[in-house]
């Protein structure tokens, strides 16, 4: 089996499995990771988190990589998210942007234990990127730097951009929750002393001007819509609340969220009792409130109707039709039926 057959889709789903789990492919990936590390450091287990497949263009896998800093005999390890892409476009000419992103990571000393944060392996049409490298989200490096986080959060609370009674901590532990180069990033900030603060989450956005160029969400609009939705639910649904963001920091194009703990609604859905029914009714009331909100609240000029939704489903399910043709046919029939029923509506 070869990479060209996998990326084209000719190898079907077995090709994806081969790239992700075969001994040959895993050894190649481990060797490339080892080349990015100091002499004594070694890559450990790789845990796949997500896989994206664009037939004919690219296969991308996102891993959490455990790194042994001083060999496998030591207990000193760290976990770093990495993104691995296979395809003809992995060597695209974006060297200038990468150089800028690497320089930012070095300036904030967030590359260690890696000596380099990117590697190309042309023989396999493969590119590896290591968190926090991202040519499009260049602020990710500084948002991964505990020193910058400390200063950023101190300024946020001192300036009143976000209300807090206990965030005067001097140390923050930064963990990458979602590392998706070019697409999205989520970071977790834990106070070094749990008694001195609460855990926060940071959703990173492309700067507003670039977001328009790439047709991507911008943080300012997301923050505004989330706050408006939270206000609407609080007003119309007694005893229910939406997750309300704490602040939008334009300098870093990041939205801060508090940590919430609770039982997932899906857990209640598995139980058939009065308590489950009560929570499901409350969730339904919240959804009804959301559905009745003015469309203008989202701040979008383009309409989004059933046809637009179906186009989106068709686009996102294209890999299924390539890898599992019989499932793709079932999806197509289901969408045709949805169009037919929609046309009958008054």
What are these regions (language model features)?
Residues 1-248, 253, 257, 266, ...:
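Phosphate/pyrophosphate-binding loops and the adjoining catalytic core of nucleotide-dependent enzymes
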Residues 180, 277-280, 346:
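Short, solvent-exposed loop/helix junctions and linker helices
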Residues 238-255, 259, 268-269, 273-335:
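A cross-family kinase active-site recognition segment
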């Amino acid at each position: 089996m070869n990479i060209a057959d996998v990326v084209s889709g000719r190898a079907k789903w077995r090709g994806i499995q081969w790239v992700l789990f075969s001994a040959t492919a895993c050894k190649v990936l481990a060797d490339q990771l080892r080349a990015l590390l100091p002499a004594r450091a070694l890559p450990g287990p790789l845990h796949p988190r997500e896989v994206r497949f664009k037939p004919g263009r690219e296969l991308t896998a996102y891993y959490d990589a455990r790194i042994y800093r001083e060999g496998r005999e030591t207990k000193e390890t760290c976990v770093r998210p990495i993104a691995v892409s296979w395809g003809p476009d992995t060597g695209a000419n974006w060297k200038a942007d990468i150089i800028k992103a690497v320089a930012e990571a070095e300036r904030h000393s967030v590359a260690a234990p890696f000596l380099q944060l990117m590697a190309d392996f042309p023989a396999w049409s493969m590119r590896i990127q290591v968190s926090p490298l991202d040519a499009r989200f260049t602020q990710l490096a500084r948002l991964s730097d505990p020193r910058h986080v400390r200063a950023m959060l101190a300024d946020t609370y001192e300036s009143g951009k976000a209300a807090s009674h206990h965030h005067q901590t001097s140390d923050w532990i930064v963990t990458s929750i979602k590392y998706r180069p070019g697409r999205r990033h989520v970071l977790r900030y834990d106070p070094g002393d749990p008694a001195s603060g609460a855990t926060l989450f940071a959703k990173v956005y492309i700067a507003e001007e670039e977001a328009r160029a790439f047709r991507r969400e911008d943080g300012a609009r997301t923050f505004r819509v989330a706050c408006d939705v939270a206000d609407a639910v609080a007003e119309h649904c007694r005893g229910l609340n939406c997750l309300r963001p704490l602040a939008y920091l334009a300098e870093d194009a990041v939205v801060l969220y508090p940590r919430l703990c609770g039982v997932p609604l899906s857990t209640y859905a598995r139980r058939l009792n009065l308590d489950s029914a009560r929570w499901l009714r409350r969730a339904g009331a919240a959804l009804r409130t959301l559905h009745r909100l003015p469309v203008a609240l989202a701040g979008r000029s383009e309409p989004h109707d059933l046809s637009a939704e179906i186009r989106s489903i068709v686009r996102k399910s294209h890999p299924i039709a390539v890898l599992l043709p019989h499932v793709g046919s079932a999806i197509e029939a289901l969408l045709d039926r949805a169009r037919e029923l929609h046309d009958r509506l008054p």
